[in-house]
Amino acid sequence: MSLTSNCAIRFLKPALTALALLAVANFGVTQETKTNKTFIDYFLPTPIVGSLFTNVWGAATVGPRDSKNGLEDETMKQWNYWDGQIIKAPDGKYHLFASRWAQARGHGGWGGSQAVHAVSDNLIGPYVDKGLCWPNDAGGRGHNVGALTLPDGSYAVYVSETRPCEVYVSKSLDGPWEHLGTVTVEGEPRWHASNVSIMVRPDGKFEFTQRDGSIFISDNGILGTYQRQGNSVYPSGIPNLEDPCIWYSGGLYHITVNSWSTRKAYHLTSADGIHDWINRGVAYDPRENIARFTDGTVDHWNKVERPSVYIENGHVVAMTLASIDVEKEQDHGNDGHGSKVIVIPFDGAAMDRDLQPATNSAKK
């Protein structure tokens, strides 16, 4: 080798080393950017189903909005709506299960809410209220309404808070709904909970969480008896957590949970749905631009609570949120204020893909 070649190598080696370090650094930035994204970054622009109007009920601070999105009383003369869970029927229609109460009673009327069923040809809406789920049982009473498809292909709707966790079942999303029974927990004969969220695990067992963040599992059907799996899985240092929503996607168990006093919600994941729940960061915040339309218009509801996910092909594709235009205590009834259920598209496939490093690490 010539002296010239040796000199060239001596000068090139530092340069090549620097380039290699730069490539590693850039790769690290790319990877970090992916893993630093949180749930809130995967909300998608919402298609405008009707038109955007300002001359509808609600505070001007919400912004121009689409009254055909989700489920609402467009006149705000009858109902406040809350909760919200979507299931797609075999015929392609979308069924939303929610609660409603007389708007004349203001937000404080939620204690007398009833479980209702609404239908739409479009995932985003509008959803048409078809009436009470069980009009001849307990006066249709129900709050914290949730719904899911059971392993045998039938359906369940469940309620909590204003009643013990009662479960109703039907072979059709259109009903009729038959009272199956009350959820039971081993060793807790007086168990009564609110904000119950139930799912079917990949192993066929039933799992639920409740307002306090405890996890319960049953290998004997949706009614249980459930086994409490330990203390709350919520992260410490975040006040007033409620409204957990639990599901499985992308090889991980997920919970979103809302801090009512800060208006922020958080996203937690676990490899087995029981242990080692990790706080992945902010899930949503109504002060951020989560409710943005495809034309760039953004709505800012005062509070968005009671999150629920709609899953297709194993990934979340939309989220429903109970939304109110003012502080709850400022909704007095017959005052042009109230609540509805909104639907926002969500890129769950991208989120699950970006969480794959975490999924693979958890499996080791």
Label each PLM-derived region with a short phrase.
Residues 31-364:
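Carbohydrate-active catalytic/glycan-binding domains of CAZyme proteins
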